[in-house]
Amino acid sequence: MSGTLLAFDFGTKSIGVAIGQRITGTARPLTAIKAQDGTPDWTLIERLLKEWQPEAVIVGLPLNMDGTEQPLTARARKFANKIHGRFGAVVKLHDERLSTVEARAGLFEHGGFRALNKGSVDSASAVIILESFFEQGF
């Protein structure tokens, strides 16, 4: 196993992307992928999978604060299922509650308002999702 994991923060306009290593438990952002109503350019997803050859793909699961599902939850599940179906990748869903809030705070701290563009926030959220996945011992 490579120990490399790829994470996505699903969104209807932008999908954040991060790459991480299980051995170090760390992740870094990659360029976010634009989406049209939640549909990405699948050739970009395929390119990422071929380039990084992750042992698994982690997709953030958007839940309400009380743990219940919201409308975007089903769409994130569908996105995860499509990655598995199209590419045969091992896909795991991971709770992403507060990842965007944490990402915005971290980016603002380091770069002010200029750092808060949509793609940066989404990919920083993907980093938080992946590092949280590592912290929970997966």
Curated annotation (Swiss-Prot):
Gene Ontology biological-process entries: rRNA 5'-end processing
Entry-linked InterPro entries: RNaseH-like_sf, YqgF, YqgF/RNaseH-like_dom, YqgF/RNaseH-like_dom_sf
GO MF assignments: nuclease activity
E.C. number(s) listed in UniProt: 3.1.-.-
PANTHER family: POLYNUCLEOTIDYL TRANSFERASE, RIBONUCLEASE H-LIKE SUPERFAMILY PROTEIN (PTHR33317:SF4)
A cellular-component GO term for this protein: cytosol
Location in the cell: Cytoplasm
Protein name: Putative pre-16S rRNA nuclease
Superkingdom of source: Bacteria
Keywords (A to Z) from UniProt: Cytoplasm, Hydrolase, Nuclease, Ribosome biogenesis
SUPFAM superfamilies in UniProt: Ribonuclease H-like
Gene3D superfamilies: YqgF/RNase H-like domain (3.30.420.140)
Family affiliation: Belongs to the YqgF nuclease family.
Function, in words: Could be a nuclease involved in processing of the 5'-end of pre-16S rRNA.
One Pfam family linked to the record: RuvX
Cytoplasm in keyword set: yes
Matching NCBIfam families: RNAse_H_YqgF
HAMAP family per record: Nuclease_YqgF (MF_00651)
UniProt gene name: yqgF
EC supergroup of this enzyme: hydrolase
Coiled-coil features, chain-numbered ranges: none
